[in-house]
Design a protein with these regions (language model features):
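Solvent-exposed loop and edge beta-strand segments that line ligand/cofactor-binding
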Residues: 17-30, 41, 77-93, 136-158, ...
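Carbohydrate-active enzyme catalytic cores, enriched for enzymes
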Residues: 213-379
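Active-site lining segments of carbohydrate-active enzymes
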Residues: 79-207, 218, 309-312, 317-326
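Short, flexible active-site-proximal loops enriched in glycine and acidic residues
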Residues: 62-74
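Active-site rim segments in enzyme catalytic domains, especially the processed small/beta chain
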Residues: 367-417
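Non-membrane alpha-helical segments in proteins
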Residues: 27-42, 54-58, 94-105
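Low-complexity, Ser/Thr/Pro/Gly-enriched N-terminal "stalk/linker" regions
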Residues: 1-14
């Protein structure tokens, strides 16, 4: 059953600030579709084809694939209800476009046997919603098209570029148009690499690494493929340092350093960490991934709107299950530009943060720290609650989880930081 999203559910973002009211049914639809697609690709008997066809038709009939919170930012109307006149490139739109591009690539012949209009319509929507806006527009902030010393770039850049490039690789048969898209993505991602601090830390937090470096890794893998290996950055020191950040931020027992909006629990991307470790020649990353995988085998099964990651994960599952992980982290790690410091011994782990507020997903504090003993949290950062309209607005620092006095900074005579 494909769940419709009502106009009132989009508008609820403006009314109460809720994102979940439209995101939850949307995510249930895309999750179900992703499972149907993977099941059909695995079995290949056409058993799931009717449901896939219904899903394709449903998505094509949607006015937008974007989320209400992002429509406000990108639409000229600045409203959260979809405007049929505007195609928006944002995280969910690009992710769904990637999944539907795989659907067209693998299944358009089978869908044509039912009715050619299904795959014809899908190809039209992918061109209109993803390929054309990517190549024709430069006004999306995440592209960082107008480079300057103060340009802000975060995980959106590699995330959206990786999905867009993959869509072009799967759909575009004109070599000149494909080359133009490849070059444009390279210029944009180069701005992201210029923005990242020289120490390679992810200022957005360890679990956001999967969206930041994780998508950068996907992008660089795609770029290496489409250029026949002529463009490869896997021997670049900054890229390796960015990759190893996730391993150095791992505490143990499923916990990771959770500064900024990151979670305190390692995310479901251990196959990604393992693949990155192999590409970068990092034994530390591979061992960390294997140890986490054996502790929590489910850590590779759920990837939001990312068919590419799921396919690549399945290629290494057997290898990971047979590998012997022996993760040993450094006793001391210091990121001088990002101002993260990690110290550990046999029993204790301490992480301290300096930095400043004008960082992606940052909180309003003079600094923060977490302390673990025998992989058990003792002094914690409460993290972040459910994202709402307030989370990424001028009201952000009115939310208690974003304030220093609810981290571990004391109040002096009743005066907060």
């Amino acid at each position: 059953k494909w769940e419709g999203v009502k106009a009132s559910q989009y508008l609820e973002y403006e009314k109460s600030g809720s994102r979940d009211i439209m995101e939850i049914p949307n995510n249930r639809n895309s999750t179900a579709f992703g499972r149907l697609l993977m099941a059909e690709l695995a079995e290949g008997k056409g058993r799931f084809l009717t449901d896939i066809m219904d899903g394709v038709f449903y998505f094509c009939e949607q006015t937008t694939w974007a989320e209400s919170a992002h429509l406000v930012a990108f639409q000229k109307s600045k409203r959260s209800i979809p405007d049929y006149r505007t195609d928006v490139l944002e995280l969910r739109q690009d992710g769904l476009a990637q999944m539907l591009s795989w659907t067209y690539y693998f299944l358009h012949d089978q869908l044509d046997k039912i009715d050619p209009i299904i795959s014809m319509r899908l190809r039209h929507e992918l061109q209109k919603r993803e390929l054309d806006p990517f190549i024709n527009r430069t006004d999306f902030w995440w592209m960082a098209w107008k480079e300057s010393p103060t340009v802000f770039v975060n995980n959106w850049n590699p995330w959206c570029n990786a999905n867009a490039l993959l869509c072009y690789m799967l759909l575009e048969n004109d070599r000149d148009k494909l080359a133009k898209a490849v070059y444009k993505s390279m210029v944009s991602v180069d701005r992201y690499l210029n923005y990242v601090k020289a120490d390679g830390a992810c200022e957005e937090g360890a679990t956001y690494w999967g969206h930041a470096f994780g998508k950068l890794f996907d992008y660089l893998s795609e770029l290496q493929m489409i250029t026949g290996g002529k463009v490869s950055l896997f021997n670049n020191k900054l890229v390796k340092d960015m990759g190893e950040f996730v391993a150095k931020s791992y505490i143990g027992n499923g916990y990771a350093v959770n500064f900024a909006d990151a979670s305190a629990h390692v995310s479901n991307y251990m196959a990604l960490v393992y693949r990155c470790g192999k590409a970068l020649g990092s034994r530390e990353m591979m061992d960390m991934a294997v140890d986490c995988f054996k502790e929590r085998p489910e850590a590779v099964t759920s990837v939001w709107l990312d068919t590419y990651k799921q396919i690549e994960a399945m290629k290494v599952l057997k290898e990971m299950s047979q590998a012997k992980g022996d993760y040993k982290a450094d006793a001391f790690t210091w990121y001088p530009q990002t101002e993260f410091c990690y110290m550990r011994n046999a029993e204790a782990f301490f992480a301290g943060k300096g930095g400043y507020n004008d960082e992606s997903h940052n909180h309003n504090d003079i600094g923060s720290f977490v302390l673990y003993y025998n992989n058990t949290p003792i002094m914690i950062d409460a993290g972040v609650g459910t994202y709402t309209r307030q989370t990424f607005s001028s009201e952000r620092y009115t939310i208690w989880t974003m304030q220093g006095n609810y981290h571990n900074i004391p109040m002096i005579n009743g005066v907060p930081e």
